[in-house]
Structures are given as C-alpha cells and as structure tokens.
C-alpha cells in the first residue's frame, strides 16, 4: 500500500491502512489522492480565512470545479466524471477531513442541487445548469421554511402558480447554504393548484432572482457557509425551469434530495472526526513530558481516547459507505434513469436517517475527546483542532436534527412507517379520544358544535370550482 503523502512528506495523521479502501475502485483512490493534494496546496489554508473572516469558500469550490468534482456524479456525456454514491461519500469526507468543512458542506448542497436536476433531466435543464458546471457554476438547495424549522420537507411559506406558459414562484427559506453566492437554486414549494398534503413541486431559480442576506451569518462553526435567510419574491420563470412534473416534489425528496444530502452530510461529519483524530495523533506523538521521559501518546488514557475514537468513527464510515454502496447497486452504479413514480434510493431512506444520526453523534464526542487528548494546546487556535470542534457541533442540529431522526426510527420500528406523518395530516385517535374523555357534557357539546361548523366550512370550500 502506497504511503499517504502531505506535500513532499508522509502524512502526519492516520495512514491508508485506517481507511475503508475496499469500497473504492482504483480510479476513486486516484481521485482521493488528488483531493488530498488539493487540500494540502490550497483548500486547508483557505479554511482558516473562511473561518476568521466569515468568507464564502468560492475559491475552494472553484478548485474542485477545475478538476471536475462539481460534476462528480454527472454522466460523462454531459461533461461530468460519471461517478457513483461511494465516490461522492469519499469526496465529501476527504474535503472535510484534510481541507475545509465549510467547503465540504457547500459542496454537499451543490451536489444535492445537481442530483435533484439529474433525477428528472431535460435537454433544457442539462444545457442551462449541468453542462456549465465545468466552468465553475455553483448550485445549492433551498428547502427550509421559517415556519417549520428543521421539518424542511413541509414548505408553508411558499407557493407557485401557472403564468404565461411558465410559473410565478415565491419562496421563503430560513436557512440556505451558499445563500447569495450560488449561481442557481433548486427550491421546493407547494404546487400550483395545491391540493394539500404532499402536493409539492421543484423549480430551479437563477441567482439574480434570489434575495439573500449573507451578512447575517455569524455562527459557531462552518463559518464560511453563509447559510442565511433567502427569499424568491414572486418571480416569473419559464416552464423549462420546473424539475419533474408538477407534484413531483415529495418523490424528489425521497429519491434524490434526502438520500444524497444524508450520505454527503454524514460523510462530512465523519471527515471532521477523522481530521480531529489526525490532529490528535500529530500532537500526542510529538509532545514530550521531559520530566517522565514520555510522549503524551505513551499514556494509556490517551491511547484509550484515540483507540475508541478511531473504532467509533470507522464504524460510522463503513456504515455510510455501506448505504452508499447499496444505493449504487440499486441504481446500476448511479446510471439508472428513473421515471416519475419509480424508486430505488428511497428504499434505503430509513438507513440514511441512521447514518446521519450515527455520524453526527459520533463526531461531537470525538472532537471533545481529541481536545482532552491534546490538553491546553488543543484549545489554542493555531493547532486547528478548535475549528474542527466548532464545525462538528453543526452535525447534531442540522436538519433533520438527531431528535427528529431518532423519533422517526423509533416510531417506524414500533408503529410502522405509515405513522410517519411528515405533513401533519393524520390525527392520533387514541390521544383525541383520551382528551375528549376529560370534558364534561357541556364542553363536549361545545366541541361538537365547533367541529360541525368546521366540517361545513371545509365541505363548502371543496364545492367551490377550481380557479382556471
């Protein structure tokens, strides 16, 4: 096995023997070596500037674009590298580990937008948004909503209507990575002629039609993300800018947006964890206590910290790569074109929830333990560990939050997938009946009258003719 290099010197962290290389093709190993080289030459140095100055990492993204990574999973016939889910996981992890976590997260959102378009490609979308990726065009996803928080799949503050052969789109988002900096935005809104529940649609909005406030972003970590509020203020777009048919949004979530985002973001958290371990190894093997003649790495407690961190992080890495590999198998190595109504990645969505939970939980613990291992030196900014620590804390709270995910999994295991009421449409009959039992007869009659009035109003609304 070749030595892992950092410039002209052997890498000072963990070697390739601690990486899950059995998942990778020879080409993917070459891509990883190229990424490490790019991180050493430029990306890692730029990470400090992004963190210090709240600077959007455009230059780092341009570097990735110069080597084809902005079109990593795009078929070669459209100018991409034609790679798969495993290569994507490797890329996100590698950039976060050796380079810049903010760049890695912006990259995740960029690839989320790219793959949402590639789920339902049209010649117009390909020519307008996919082929230009080679010239450094950057996309992002805008799916959050100020009214629903981390329940990003429920866009209340949005809408679209048909107009002049195209659409008028309005969108408000509380969090959008690359807001104000991306060249195009893949957004989700309620559909034209919204029929309720999961009737959602996906559109691509050009950057000049988006209003953003990047100056408001000043966070604990991932300080280059510029993940600020965004608005699309009733913009008219052409009919070519819808992604998939009207009403395809929920299917797009399950088949593209969620799987790609969860694989990518989980890989970022794993990369941050490995990067912190790399720094911990470098410090503890070099720092000596002259009075006892030992390096910090010679103490059993430090060995325990590092050993457990490596074991837990590699368990998470293999978990992520396994789910990515399963999606590769289901999609014929990311080459299968699915028609609306067909699913492949969505069959593994409940596994994708688990990898995000595991990776985010693990990285928060690992960075703390590496700080303990490095002691006061790790608390200082010049070691970089404190930046990794701050970046890591985004994992747990980034939507879907770990609280949401573990409830999804617990509910699905105990009660079945059908109880996962994403759009708040199914009532809990047991809870309702239990609450009604507490009412006296007068209160029950009052509630019944109120419900009958609401039922009459709902029936009247349904009877109204639809707008042309």
How would you describe each model-predicted region?
Residues 8-24:
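Short, contiguous pre-domain boundary segments
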Residues 48, 52-66, 70-177:
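Glycine-rich flavin
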Residues 3-10, 374-468:
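Glycine-rich phosphate/cofactor-binding loops in nucleotide/flavin-utilizing enzymes
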Residues 174-180, 260-265, 395-398:
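Glycine-rich phosphate/pyrophosphate-binding beta-alpha loops
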Residues 258-262, 295-309, 347-358, 386-394:
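Alpha-helical scaffold segments that form or flank carboxylate-/histidine-based iron centers
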Residues 172-213:
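A short core secondary-structure module
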Residues 217-314:
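Glycine-rich beta->alpha junctions and the first turn(s) of the following alpha-helix
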Residues 47-52, 314-358, 371-379:
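C-terminal helix-coil-helix/basic helical segment that borders enzyme active sites and/or dimer interfaces
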């Amino acid at each position: 096995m070749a030595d892992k290099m950092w410039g002209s010197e052997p890498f000072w962290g963990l070697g390739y023997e601690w990486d899950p290389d059995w998942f990778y093709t020879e080409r993917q190993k070459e891509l990883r070596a190229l990424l490490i080289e790019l991180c050493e030459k430029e990306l890692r140095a730029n990470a400090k500037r992004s963190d210090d100055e709240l600077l959007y990492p455009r230059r780092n993204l341009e570097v990735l674009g110069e080597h084809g990574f902005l079109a990593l999973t795009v078929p070669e016939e459209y100018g991409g590298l034609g790679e798969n889910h495993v290569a994507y996981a490797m890329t996100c992890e590698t950039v976060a580990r050796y380079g810049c976590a903010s760049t890695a997260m912006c990259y995740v959102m960029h690839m989320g937008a790219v793959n949402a378009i590639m789920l339902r490609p049209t010649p117009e979308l390909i020519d307008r948004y996919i082929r230009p990726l080679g010239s450094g065009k950057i996309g992002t996803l805008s799916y959050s909503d100020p009214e629903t928080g981390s329940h990003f799949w429920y866009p209340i503050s949005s809408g679209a209507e048909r107009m002049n052969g195209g659409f008028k789109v309005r969108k408000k988002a509380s969090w959008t990575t690359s807001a104000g900096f991306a060249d195009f935005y893949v957004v989700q809104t309620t559909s034209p002629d919204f029929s309720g529940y999961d009737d959602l649609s996906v559109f691509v909005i050009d950057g000049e039609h988006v209003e953003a406030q990047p100056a408001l972003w000043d966070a604990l970590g991932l300080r280059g993300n510029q993940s600020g509020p965004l608005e699309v203020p009733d913009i008219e777009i052409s009919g070519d800018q819808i992604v998939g048919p009207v009403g395809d949004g929920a299917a797009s979530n399950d088949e593209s947006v969620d799987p790609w985002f969860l694989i990518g973001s989980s890989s970022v958290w794993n990369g941050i964890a490995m990067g912190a371990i790399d720094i911990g190894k470098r410090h503890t093997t070099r720092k000596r206590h002259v009075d006892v003649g030992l390096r910090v790495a010679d103490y059993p407690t430090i060995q325990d910290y590092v050993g457990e961190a490596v074991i837990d992080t590699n368990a998470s890495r293999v978990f992520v790569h396994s789910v990515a590999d399963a999606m590769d198998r289901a999609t014929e190595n990311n080459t299968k074109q699915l028609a609306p109504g067909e699913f492949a990645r969505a069959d593994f969505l409940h596994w994708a929830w688990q990898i995000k939970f595991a990776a985010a939980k693990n990285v928060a613990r690992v960075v703390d333990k590496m700080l303990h291992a490095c002691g006061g030196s790790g608390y200082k900014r010049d070691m970089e560990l404190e930046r990794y620590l701050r970046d890591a804390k985004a994992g747990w709270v980034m939507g879907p939050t770990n609280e949401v995910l573990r409830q999804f999994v617990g509910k699905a295991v105990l009660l079945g997938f059908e109880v996962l009421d994403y759009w708040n449409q199914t009532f809990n009959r047991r809870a309702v009946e239990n609450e009604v039992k507490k009412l006296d007869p007068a209160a029950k009659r009052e509630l019944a009258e109120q419900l009958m009035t609401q039922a009459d109003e709902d029936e009247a609304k349904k009877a109204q003719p639809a707008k042309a």
